[in-house]
Amino acid sequence: MPDILSQGGGRETGPWPRRVAAVAVLALVAVLIVHYLPQSRHRTARPARAAVTVTPPPAVSSAVSGDAGVVEEPDGITGRILSWPGGLRVPATGERPVWFWPATGQVVPIGGLPPQRSGYQFTRAAGGWAVQADPGTQAGCGSCAGPQRAVYFLADSGRSATRAGLADAVAPGVPGTLWLTSYPTDAAPHTAAGVAREVSIAGRQLGPQFRLPAGYLIEQGTSRGLLLVPVTSRAGKIADKLWDPAAPQASRTFDGVIAASATQIAWSPSCVARCRVQVLNLTTGRQASVELPAASSVANAAFSPNGSSLVIQVSFSDNTTNGARAVQLERVSLASGRLTTVPQTWVSSDALIGFGWPASSDNLVAEFSFTTKVQLTSWRPGASRLAIVVLRPQHSPASLVIGQHSS
């Protein structure tokens, strides 16, 4: 029976953006990046859910300095802050990917990845990252898959990436595995059926190849099959599909998937007034329902590395002419259903670049862009304040890898 997890009275939450980066790993799909101020840093674009009207809370002031103490600079997250954890590092993509230590500004090249003019795509996997060269622009056939590209695995604690194979697309699997999908060079992935194979992170093939349903791409390999997403959006909403190659007729669909791991799927079905987040544990079959307050919804989330919690981005319509919303990060304990606000994260939707766990630890990392600065935050559950650093262009990489997909 479903286990109903109620948020409780009166907490404010709201709509969030939906991930699209699974599509970005194919040559046919343009990588959706937008410039944000300052210093032309990049982020992956995230389409928003339908607006929900609510009364906006007080505006959030902005800013910070990278040292522990009281934030003094205008335009950013304000208040008392903590020092950045000394050992916490994040990868940065680009022509030559690097490891970046926000606490010190140290930058070290990631070994095993040759220089790539088009840059690299990073996809979060258990214990590390799947890394693949960005496809760039295909001459003569913009919708074709093009030549296959090398796939690498970069461990959270690794100094170098290890080659895992060649493919047109890569997706995370159960721990220690990746799923590689290939197409004929002249095929259009939005209509063609890709051929997928499971490999170890060292590149050893683990089983037979499977032909995917035409027009679908693997988002996540799970303990109960492959979570598939449409390669491109089409007229009308197409649900994601949990597909078992051995029993394709038994597929289950999910409307509005917001996060997935090897053992859990979270989704937020379309709603009008009272929205819910559903979480299915694929190992036990247990389904939980997290109720959001009235007039709020959600469109993006991330499971913690150990699977014990789900962080959701909640947003509110503020009825402004530019369509911006107030957003806030909330952590849901999947054991108790308790919802905890991540402190100091009430900002405009335009300010939140991304969030996730760039290492297998309890530290949730988020990136924010304000008018005069970009801030990187770290939060450990139970802490009453954030650790914050200001990312200055002359001392930090341009494209940090924060969320599930980055390029």
What are these regions (language model features)?
Residues L88, W129-A130, T177-L178, L226-L227, ...:
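Hydrophobic beta-strand positions that form the internal "hydrophobic ladder"
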Residues P91, Q132, T181, L228-P230, ...:
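Residue-level marker for isolated small/hydroxyl-bearing positions within beta-strands
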Residues M1-W16:
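Terminal targeting segments of Actinobacterial cell-envelope proteins
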Residues A299-E330, I353-P358, A366:
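Loop/turn-rich, solvent-exposed surfaces of beta-rich toroidal or solenoidal domains
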Residues V31-V60:
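C-terminal region of N-terminal signal peptides and the immediate post-cleavage residues
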Residues E73-I81, P114-A126, A164-G176, R211-R224, ...:
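Repeated scaffold domains used in trafficking and secretory/extracellular systems
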Residues W16-L37:
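Secretory targeting and sorting signals
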Residues A51-P74, A92-Q116, Q138-L166, A187-P213, ...:
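Surface-exposed loop/turn elements that mediate protein-protein interactions on large endomembrane-trafficking
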